[in-house]
UniProtKB/Swiss-Prot annotation:
Sequence similarity: Belongs to the tropomodulin family.
Protein name: Leiomodin-3
Superkingdom of the source species: Eukaryota
Domain WH2: 534-553
Alphabetic keyword roster: Coiled coil, Cytoplasm, Cytoskeleton, Disease variant, Nemaline myopathy, Ubl conjugation
Subcellular location, principal: cytoplasm
Originating gene: LMOD3
Compositional bias per record (Polar residues), positions renumbered to this chain: 183-192
Originating species: Homo sapiens
Any one of the GO CC terms: cytoplasm
Associated disease: Nemaline myopathy 10: An autosomal recessive severe form of nemaline myopathy. Nemaline myopathies are muscular disorders characterized by muscle weakness of varying severity and onset, and abnormal thread-like or rod-shaped structures in muscle fibers on histologic examination. NEM10 is characterized by early-onset generalized muscle weakness and hypotonia with respiratory insufficiency and feeding difficulties. Additional features include arthrogryposis or congenital contractures, ophthalmoplegia, a history of prematurity, reduced fetal movements, and polyhydramnios.
Record note on modification: Ubiquitinated, leading to its degradation. Interaction with KLHL40 negatively regulates ubiquitination and degradation.
Subcellular location: Cytoplasm; Cytoplasm, Myofibril, Sarcomere, M line; Cytoplasm, Myofibril, Sarcomere, A band; Cytoplasm, Cytoskeleton
Location of region: Interaction with tropomyosin alpha: 1-49
Length: 560
């Protein structure tokens, strides 16, 4: 007891000596954080759930507080989007006749299942009832045996024989029940077979089958086995995938367009084969891949294709599963392509995002040939930048066309000048030195080959000479036409002196004159509307008159 009392006294002294407030005040901020973390590990708050007691070991700062409702909404949205993707990738479409037959099959199957279940339940109930009866009889026999303990051994043997007979009867009943179930199933199958045969034997069904056979072309069925596959496609696109891929690889010059729009369940490997085959093709102008389930891998392959292809002008990849990364990759490779004029990538499954839109606007500056873009920008900034860049490209294309037209006109003029020089016998370049006028369109008519001469009257028979004499001979136009003669007539021009002319030095620009031209033109203000008095008129006349025209006037008597 003495030792225990001593220990308690020492603990009390230690508690009195230790001051926690002073110790905590002396600790630094880092030491306080360490102490707090250790205390949380040693003695966690019992009111918190287990998931929040655990220490957060992530270095990244949290983006926001935990929200259970937003997490549930996100999970529901992910589940719904996954279901929509599966429905879009594997659409289930049937023709009306197929839907009817499928409904009939389902109804017949339901009836068969219900009949089988009903028969099984009935037989099971009968078996259970028989077992209960047999158990009841055995219980009665046991009670009788207890009461009649003094009976002979013969009676015991008879009781054992009765038990064996009851077990055999139960087995026989179970076998009969199984046979009845099998017979019911066979009967159901026979009923369904009879119903299908009756439907086939009906005159309406026979007429429909005859119509279908008459609509089909036996030549097409014999030559092309893919005809049946194409006709059953619900999208309506009758493109033969294998045949078109073969033609693209062979670089068929007759194939100018490749349309794969709305074709269901195209494997990704085949899409990649199409895109890779387009790299070396030189004849296809339009390539359409709308609503075919293309993803980022197809987009990256398209970007590489645009980097190498030099013939495609329009590309359509609308209504697919391409994200912003794939679109940015395509736009990045457009700086190496100078033939694409139209690009459509609207209505994607995922939003591109603001960063992708700004990147598209930045990358489009390096391309000078794209004229149309099928996409609605969400941000106003990239939208304005892209519209300005497309108008710039259109202006450049217009200027290029105008230059080509001018060059074509110059070539035509040179051809006409060469024709003039050859026709007039001038040496080459003499027409320009003489300062001749520019060739006119009438010169082509002048230098056309002359019409054939009339036949010699000596070689013509006498019967045709009288007819030729009656008809007045028409002189050729190039001899009597005065306008063409005036154009061909050369003009007299003074010869240029060989001595170089004394050129005047260029006038220096006067800065004061330039400043005056930059000033706005002063407006002449109209005079104020004031009535002129006789005194003002007199003074005005005196100002505009001279002393020679003044008349001497005598002074009145009053003034004198």
């Amino acid at each position: 007891m003495s030792e225990h009392s001593r220990n308690s006294d020492q603990e009390e002294l230690l508690d009195e000596e230790i001051n926690e407030d002073e110790i905590l005040a002396n600790l630094s901020a880092e030491e306080l954080k360490e102490l707090q973390s250790e205390m949380e590990v040693m003695a966690p708050d019992p009111s918190l759930p287990v998931g929040m007691i655990q220490k957060d070991q992530t270095d990244k700062p949290p983006t926001g507080n935990f929200n259970h409702k937003s997490l549930v909404d996100y999970m529901y949205w992910e589940k719904a989007s996954r279901r929509m993707l599966e429905e879009e990738r594997v659409p289930v479409t049937f023709v009306k006749s197929e839907e009817k037959t499928q409904e009939e099959h389902e109804e017949i199957e339901k009836r068969n299942k219900n009949m089988a279940q009903y028969l099984k339940e009935k037989l099971n109930n009968e078996i259970v009832a028989n077992k209960r009866e047999s158990k009841g009889s055995s219980n009665i026999q046991e009670t009788d045996e207890e009461d009649e303990e003094e009976e002979d051994d013969d009676d015991d043997d008879e009781g054992e024989d009765d038990g064996e007979e009851s077990e055999e009867t139960n087995r026989e009943e179970e076998g009969k029940a199984k046979e009845q179930i099998r017979n019911c199933e066979n009967n159901c199958q026979q009923v369904t077979d009879k119903a299908f045969k009756e439907q086939r034997d009906r005159p309406e069904a026979q007429e429909q089958s005859e119509k279908k056979i008459s609509k089909l072309d036996p030549k097409k069925l014999a030559l092309d086995t893919s005809f049946l596959k194409v006709s059953t496609r619900p999208s309506g696109n009758q493109t033969d995938l294998d045949g078109s891929l073969r033609r693209v690889r062979k670089n068929d010059p007759d194939m100018k367009e490749l349309n794969l729009n709305n074709i269901e369940n195209i494997p990704k490997e085949m899409l990649l084969d199409f895109v890779n085959a387009m790299k070396k093709n030189k004849h296809i102008k339009t390539f359409s891949l709308a609503n075919v389930g293309a993803d980022e891998n197809v987009a990256f392959a398209l970007a590489n294709m645009l980097r190498e292809n030099r013939s495609i002008t329009t590309l359509n990849i609308e209504s697919n599963f391409i994200t912003g990364k794939g679109i940015v990759a395509i736009m990045r490779c457009l700086q190496f392509n100078e033939t694409l004029t139209e690009l459509r990538f609207h209505n994607q499954r995922h939003m591109l995002g603001h960063h992708a839109e700004m990147e598209i606007a930045r990358l489009l500056k390096a391309n000078n040939t794209l004229l149309k873009m099928g996409y609605h920008f969400e941000l106003p900034g990239p939208r304005m930048v892209v519209t300005n860049l497309l108008t710039r490209n259109q202006d450049k294309q217009r200027q290029k066309r105008q230059e080509e037209q001018k060059q074509q006109q110059l070539k035509e003029q040179k051809k006409l000048i060469a024709m003039l020089e050859n026709g007039l016998g001038l040496p080459p370049g003499m027409w320009e030195l003489l300062g001749g006028p520019k060739p006119d369109s009438r010169m082509q008519e002048f230098f056309q080959p002359p019409p054939p001469r009339p036949p010699n009257p000596q070689n013509v028979p006498f019967s045709q000479r009288s007819e030729m004499m009656k008809k007045p001979s028409q002189a050729p136009k190039y001899r009597t036409d005065p306008d063409s003669f005036r154009v061909v007539k050369l003009k007299r021009i003074q010869r240029k002196s060989r001595m170089p002319e004394a050129r005047e030095p260029p006038e220096k620009t006067n800065l004061k004159d330039v400043i005056k031209t930059l000033k706005p033109v002063p407006r002449n203000r109209p005079p104020p509307l004031v009535e002129i008095t006789p005194r003002d008129q007199l003074l005005n006349d005196i100002r505009h008159s001279s002393v020679a025209y003044l008349k001497p006037v005598q002074l009145p008597k009053e003034l004198a």
